[in-house]
Each structure stands twice: as C-alpha cells, then as structure tokens.
C-alpha cells in the first residue's frame, strides 16, 4: 500500500464521514426524505468498498452492517426512527475513531461488536425477508437528435436512476453531462436490485429518449482498482479546476517569503543611510510585487470556517440528548474564510463555548415551557468578516448569565470587594468569568463547570491577537463574540522605543501620537490619568510595564494613544522609529500562558529582534 493511496483513502473517508453526519442530521428532521436515505446509503456503500479494498476489514464490516440497515430503509421495509438514527450516529463515531487510528499508523481496530449487534437487531433477523439481490448494469442511453435540452434530459435520467440504486460511474462524467459536453448518448453504471425491464421502463418514460440498452456486468474483483479509479477521477477533476497542495509546502514557501521581507527591510535601511534614490525607487516597485506575492500566498492558506464548524451539529445533538434538552444549532457564514493557522487555534475554544451554551445556557424543556419559551432552544453560530478580522459569535436564547451570582462568587474568591462590585458595569462583571478557576455552576457537570475553561479560552484567543467579549440578559440568552485576525504572518506595525528597548505596536491598534506635559498627569486611586479629547484615559509608561527606567523626568512626554477591545489608553514612549511591515514569529515555549503581553517577535533590517505587543492584554 503506497503512501499516496493511504492519503487518498483518509481524504475520501473524511469526506464521506462528513457527508454521512450532515445527511443524518437532515434525515432526523425529515425522516421520509428518500433522497437523503439514498445519499446516506451511497456514502456507506462507497466507504465499505474503499475500506475492503485497502484491507481495513473492521471498517468494512461496520459499514457493511450499516449498509444492510440503510438498504432496508431505502426499500421502505424499515422506518426512520430516533433509535435508528442514534445507532447510525454511533456507527459514524466509531468510524471517525477508526479512521483516526488508521491515520496514525493503525489498522482501524475498535470494539464494534455491540454496535453491530444493535444494527442486526434493527433488521429483525427472525423474520424472513424476500430481499432482492443487487446487480450491476451498464446502461447506454441515447437522446433524440432533435432534442433541444440534451443536458436536462440526461440529468433527469441520472436522477431517476439514482433513486433506483447507486450510480458508480458515468461516461462522460457528471460535470460534462451537465455542461452538455457529449453528442447524443452517454453511459451509466448502476448497482440496483431492480430488473432490466424496470430500468428501461423508467428511462423510456422520460420524453425525448430514443433508445435504452441495459446490460448486466460481471463484477471483477481487483484489489486496488477502486482506489486507482477514485484517484483518476480526482485527478481529472483537479486538472479542470483546482490542485491540492499540502499545507507544509505552502508554509515552506511562506517562510522563504518572510525571509525576503526581512532582507527587504535591511536593504531599506541601507537605502535610507546612503540616500540612494534610485535604489529607493526600485525598492518601491519591489514592495508592490512583494505585496502581490504575499496576498497570493495568504489566499492559498485561507480555508472556510466550515472546516471547524462542521463538527458541531453532531456534537450539539449528542450533548443535548445526554442532558435531556432540545436544541437547534443554526450555522451562518460557514463559507467565511480565515488563515488555516488561525483555524487550527480556534477549534478548542469554540468547542468549550458551545458546550457551555448547551450545558449552562440552554434550559430543559420543562423550564423553557414554564418561562413561556419554545421548548427547543436555539444556538446560533455565526461567522463574518469585519475589516481585517473575522468575527465569530455564539448566540443562545437560554437562561442568560446571573450577574448577582457572578458578583457573589467574585467577592467570595476575593477577586473584587463588595464596594467595588457596586460600581461595576455589565461588561466588567461578565469579564470576571474569564478569571482563572472562576465558575458559577451550582454543581460540577461532565461537560463544563469545572472552572478551568473560559480563562484558557481567553488566553488562546489573546495569543493569536484576538479578543473575546460577552453580552447577556437574564432569561433572554447570551452572546460570546470572538474577533480574530484574518492572518498571523505579516502585519503592519509602528516601531517605538522606550528607555532601553524597541517594541512593535500593531498599527490597527494605534489612534495617534501626541505630546503631553508631565504636569497634566493626574494620580487617582493608584492610576495615572489624563484628559484626552474630553475623555479621561489611563496612561502607562511602556518601559516601566517591563521593569525599565521610567521616562517621567522629562519636560515633555511622547504619548502613543492606542485602543483595544475594552478601552482607549496612552503609552508613554521615548521615540517613534517609524511604520514597518513585519513578519510575526511565534514565541513558542519562551513565554508561559500567563505572560501573554506579546503576540510574537520579529527581526528588523539591522538584525535586531523586537517583541510585538499584544495590546488586548493591557
């Protein structure tokens, strides 16, 4: 078995599993939809064939048992019930685990005996059934030459045949047929329990069909042919539209480009020092070209948030059943694109927030009825672009957050005093939820409420330059809003100097730079404040924040006014070096989770390493 074959199997298996889960969720809402049943059967059938071909026998056995049940449903001998859907979902969970095992070098081994027994029980084996044997037919269909809409007639034929069984091949392929890229005839390979006569009758019932020839095919067992065929079809499809590239290759290319940005910065400094205008002119043109390359590379790394969102419908369904709740998960903006690196970081925080909404937000059916609500709770998961950020919102119509309970817990843990609590805004109260170990759950549940979640969620979001906020109204619901950058690689920044070091400040956070008189600074309750455009803002000495010598002994101070998600404030600095496009490098294990004042570091043209401030932590 080659690595390419295994990679293709993993990729195809993941796609079929996602299709199974998506269609099962729809079937649960529309149990009489025969087309959905056919789609689910087709996915299971293909999965079985792929697994058997690759030698993963347990996977093949489980999908074969699934296929038997689905075939009974497809032929109206078994009804779609909640119990049946539950068992099929259990199967897909097993399959996900088995495919993961294969991906990590295993053989997909798992204890599936109980699940297979549950599937067999659905079939009532004690009752004799007259099940027709499926056969494979090659069907040649010829459309009348005078037909005006050949593609329409051909697609109608394909849809009718799909209702009768599994279409394993079309010549030409489906896309070419839909685009009318064929003469007057095409061929279909169909697996079905129907007879030749029944197939012919169905096709000839469609107008403008001139001739149908149905020939039974003898199936040849070939060990690797199905996978080769899939690879051939995939290659043909990709030649026309796309090409799949491993993320590692894009990362290597991006790293090389990032080095070129650093080298360009060095040449910029040389050009400035030598005042070489011709070199500066060429560098300007080179910068434009670099920008296009950068945009192209970043676009290659953009993936839809659906790659994370698609795991949640099944998760919410499972958790809701465990808790005896009725919950609808509504997803909006699943096609919103964001950097693959960012996507990889936000998966776990979103899992925790959605589990929180299911566990603490959504009420039981009885409580919702008592409060005059629809017995089914709704959780909305939304994604949309906002400037250079992607916004993700988790909105529920549940119980909301009890502010009094939050404050009492905070006072008990000495996070705030009772006097301070009386002056706190709603936003400040909800921010307490993100303190380490904070939880208002009456009892610890298996899902959440252990007080080890929301602080980790916030720290993860902050580490990627994002921010998180909460809005809530008791008995009306809560909204958790996450803003994350589109990409983490290259950012526009303002380079500033303190008494001892240089720092990079993301340009998106900078409002303006002004000079102030030290006498204008007022000391109130341990904070330094100034009047900025008729608003009182806090002033921080940036160097002093990192144990450097303060700059307050001068006659005039340079103040960089910056904004984060919560507030506007000022940073006292020694000098502004200038605006730079910088490459953001992560700090890895150099800083612990509690030291998140920096989102990363960069290398300047002169070789200096500069830390990049994460102003959301100030």
From Swiss-Prot:
Q: Where in the cell is it found?
A: Cytoplasm
> What Gene3D superfamilies does the entry give?
Histidine kinase CheA-like, homodimeric domain, Histidine kinase CheA-like, P2 response regulator-binding domain, Histidine kinase-like ATPase, C-terminal domain, HPT domain, SH3 Domains
PROSITE patterns of this UniProt entry? CHEW, HIS_KIN, HPT
Which keywords fit this entry according to its UniProt record?
Answer: ATP-binding, Chemotaxis, Cytoplasm, Kinase, Nucleotide-binding, Phosphoprotein, Transferase, Two-component regulatory system
Please write the reaction equations for the catalytic activity of this protein: ATP + protein L-histidine = ADP + protein N-phospho-L-histidine
One GO molecular function term of this record is:
ATP binding
Give the EC number(s) under which this enzyme is classified: 2.7.13.3
Which InterPro entries does the record match to this protein? Bact_Chemotaxis_CheA (IPR051315), CheA-like_dim (IPR004105), CheA-like_homodim_sf (IPR037006), CheA-like_P2_sf (IPR037052), CheA_P2-bd (IPR010808), CheW-like_dom_sf (IPR036061), CheW-lke_dom (IPR002545), CheY-binding_CheA (IPR035891)
Give yes or no: UniProt keyword Transferase: yes
Q: Which GO terms describe its cellular component?
A: cytoplasm
Q: Name one process (GO BP) from the record.
A: chemotaxis
One Pfam family cited in the UniProt record for this chain: CheW
Keyword match Iron: no
Q: Which residues form the CheW-like domain?
A: 490-618
The record places domain Histidine kinase at: 233-488
Phosphohistidine: residues bearing it? 45
Q: Give the HPt domain ranges.
A: 1-102
Q: Which domain of life is it from?
A: Bacteria
Biological role: Involved in the transmission of sensory signals from the chemoreceptors to the flagellar motors. CheA is autophosphorylated; it can transfer its phosphate group to either CheB or CheY.
Name it: Chemotaxis protein CheA
Q: Which organism is it from?
A: Listeria innocua serovar 6a (strain ATCC BAA-680 / CLIP 11262)
